[in-house]
Amino acid sequence: MAKPRLLKLAGLVLIVVLAAAAYLLLWPVITQKAEHRLAAIGLTPNEVAANGPLPGDVSLYLKELACAEKLPTPGYYRSINGAELTDAQRSGLFTCATFTGAFSGPNQVYAWRSADGYQGASYINNRKPGELYITGGDFPPASGPIPAGPFIAKADATTGRQIWRTYLDNGNASGAWIASTNLNILPNGNIVTAWANQVVLLDGDTGRILKHNTLPTGPTGAADANYKHLTIAPDGTVILKDQTRPTGCTLQGTMAILKCSMEGMKQGASNMVAVHPETLEVLDSIALPEPATVPHIIAMFEGKIAIYVGVNSGALRYFWDPAARKLSQDKSWVVAPMQKGQTTSDAPSILGDWIVLQTNGIGSDTVASSIVVAHQKDAAKTKVIFPFGPLKPGEWSFAPPKPQTDPENSMIYSADMGVGKVAGIKLDQATGEMKTVFVIENSTNAFQPLLGPKDQRVLLLSNFKRRVESEPLKLALFTGNYNEQVTWRDAATGRIIAESDFFEPLTLGSLITPGFGGRVYFPTGKGFIAMQVMPAPTAQK
């Protein structure tokens, strides 16, 4: 009897040993798979496909940087995007950025979120490959407690892991109107940024505040001024202009301008200042005759530094004289592009000798949006086109983004979120005549940046989709009750080349920013999503 019992005991011991060995060998694999499945819950197919951070094509980094360093961007750090929007002309043209997908043929979009959160991320800039700068904290709720900000942060360009963050304000404590700011990198790598009536210079390596100044706001009180618009002149002088919140409005955020204007409140006139890029000394200040809600651009005109300003009634031209340290208005050049029923024009764009304007920047229930071009030498020489035709009963035209231009291809791109369409327009640069080349169904209120070479230009568009289809567009926009995706399109035809999954909304008024190695960055209310397009993998047998 003893022997069978011993054999049974030995068998039990062997089973236990084998079970323990199996546990030790297999449990890490089982755990890893379980953790992977848990981590994948809530991810979109684009994120599942990436399964981790996206470095992009690292073989392109030095080539793209060398290309960018050859571009004429005086006043700005030479990188793929060292300015709020490419350069002083805010051209939105990124010829050194690479589209890594197939121009014709199926593509796969990969996406991955930043490791750290950046509330209200709005603009993202590159310096060297691997370096990413983010402005955020400037997209608060309209009322109630607001997040601290604005802030500037530096992050790893692949993981989104924060390196440093510098907070500039806290509206709960200061009482300041906190609205959108922008981000520009100086040639020496430092950062100049402004908000409310304040301007600071930051060390681009450490985030330390090097200089600060308070800016005059002219005819409008400081409580309703926001020096969001900052552009650098060819001589290096920083030209700033403020947005103004309607008098009596107490809402926070940039959308306060639209919401309170729709309630009949009136904006005060804007102010423009010239500031030294190193000392932040105010060199000159000039009051504008009316509000200027949209950004200005800077270009050379007949040997002078010209500043084209979109104002609520149209567009004006100012000159900056570095020798005299003087800002002045050119009263011979005034454009009034709006027809009865249309609203303010958006920020101007340049195409050859023409200044391009988009109407209905704050919306119209009665008249469709139009594109107007005015000659730089003669403001009376204008042409107009209605790319989407007349406004139908019950439609709302809302076209807040500036028109995108492509001088090499003589193309203009117009986006009207209200009617849910984007148009490609061909301009005859000799005569100013325009012809609509294509109209596509794509609802966006964002910029329309262009990537790559002249013969294979790629148009980047966000695409807005309401979560409740029957919900009025205005309500969905004001409450953020919608999702948004990125589409990559053939800029010549509007044809979709690739499209991402739908994510939370792109931060209002921000840019889908091209990065090194074929990546783009999609800023959101929580941080950013890096994306890359690659040719779709062939199916494995």
List each language-model region with its residue ranges.
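Sequence/structural signature of beta-propeller modules
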Residues: 16-109, 533-541
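Repeated scaffold domains used in trafficking and secretory/extracellular systems
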Residues: 116-125, 172-183, 219-232, 290-300, ...
